[in-house]
Amino acid sequence: MNSDSPIIEIRNLSRRYGKLDAVNGLSLSVRPGKCYGFFGRNGAGKTTTIKCLLNLLRPDSGEVRMFGLDPRRDEVAVKARLSYVPDLVAFYPWMSVQDTLAYLASFRKNWNTGIEADLLARFHLDPKQKASHLSKGQRTQLALIGAICPEPELLVLDEPTSGLDPIVRREFIETVIGAYQSSDPGRRTVFVSTHLISEFEGLIDEFTIIDQGRNLLTMEADAARDQFRKIRVRFAEVPAGLDLSAALKVKQNGREMEILANGNSEELLAQITSHSPEELRCEALSLEEIFVASDLLPKAAA
């Protein structure tokens, strides 16, 4: 595997549960050193996709490659190079925080004790506290420490901030993930499935939005912000001849309008300007706003 090869590659992945298509013909590719967002509503197929990546579920069809390897055939080699934090985490209840981390470290070739000490202090976790006495948020914190200390090439995170309070969430996202990637930016890759999109806004390089197991939109984050625009306009009187049929969505409140554009903001701005508005602003959408707007995009045929 060379330095430009995808860390994750999914081609036409499908997985059914009875008659339900949890994942249906999904394809995506994650490049090294990127923070890749995997977005979708609850039940869209995100966790099923991740489980297929990690050989926790067997796909019905399609191909999955991690580091250029088949995670079914080369499971040990693949998992030695990554860390995974699921939405729900559990530990042996009789072990302390310290014992749990020592147990996790015993399976790893590398373990950074400096990172361990730093994160225990940041999260205010007592090393002697039993796992059975940890809250859901504290268990998530412990899982995150266990995932980052081996300094893996890939972090796979499924709703990693679930159960964390807002202050700890922000510190984890901005400091912990940021520091993980910045220590070796060309090599450290993050694949994060989350519904708290706004909190990862500054870290996401590229993303895929899935809907009913299908790829709805894949873009680089900066390109998406350029493509999806919000136009705010106020007229003295809304002109009868204003044609906004090319807009993704139009919301009107009296003399004011909010218009969503998908790659055609210049065309819409020209149309609006020709009617001499009192006020006109055009701004990029956030990733969360793009996620909401993606529901207006055409869906793939079943």
Q: Residue locations for each model-derived region?
A:
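Conserved ABC transporter NBD signature motif
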Residues: 62-73, 77-78
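A short, proline-enriched helix->beta-strand linker immediately N-terminal to the Walker B motif
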Residues: 149-153
